[in-house]
Amino acid sequence: MIVENKKQLKEFIKSYKSEDSIVIPIPCDGNKHSVNTKLSTLYVQLLGGREFILPFNHSETLNIEIPNLKSDTKKYTYDRKKLNHFVKLDNVIDVNLLYYMATNKSLNIEEIDTNAHHFFNMRYYKRNNINTIIPVLKHLEKCREIAKILKDTVEKYAEHVKMTYNNEVLDNLSYIEQNGLQTTNGVVFSEYNLYTSTGRPSNRFGGTNFAALNKTDGSRKPYVSRFKNGVLVEMDFDGYHLRLIADKIGYKFPEGSVHEYMAKLYGVGYDEAKGLSFQYLYGLFLKR
């Protein structure tokens, strides 16, 4: 059902508040950061099978205002963090997180598209808000395919949900993202990705890797405080990963820099020792 009037909305709300559901947001412009675009439609599939499309910004529909969608039922979505930027709901479980906690891999559904999506994105690649002109039924086709993957994942890995990560970590990252980073040319937005092979979040968007800005070529200079006479303060742990491992195995480092200590063990300089430690941590083994 496409919800386009008060009667249909009332019917939807009644069903939505009585049953767990899959929730998939469709932004107006998928190429923009979620903070910089609006919600075009919201696809909701109840776990019993009923489907609803709520249109807010689409050329084919009678658009409605975003209703109050808070309820006690569970909502499963692919990206809770992204959903937070469009609409804040209670009891939302990130299915990508479920899968990652069980397999150390991320679900890959970004490439799921219909022929219509491919056509519009190639033909009108310069146009903003392309999702508002892609036919609603094609969005429905795409969402059904995504929903099937999400439901299968929930059935298989539901016990792997880590509520601290699901609630606190994802919501805090949403908050950090929506505040953006002040630069000399305005505010830019980043996007955190928890689902890396090492478990160390990455942070990039629009071709910029914010977690690895070069320290020597001036790449960091445009980033400034948003406050008058403000400053940016960077804090870092000395040998954080090495210290975590040492704590786990009961090893005690001496006072001082961990990397300087490891440099002496390796018989190399500080910078090389730091690089070697990370390589050993993440899969490089010494040749015998």
Question: What positions do the PLM features span?
Answer:
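Acidic, glycine-rich two-metal-ion catalytic cores of nucleic acid-processing enzymes
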Residues: 2, 18, 24-50, 56-60, ...
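Conserved DEDDh/DEDDy metal-dependent 3′-5′ exonuclease domain
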Residues: 2-10, 16-154, 239
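Helical catalytic core of nucleic-acid polymerases
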Residues: 84-164, 169-179, 183, 209, ...
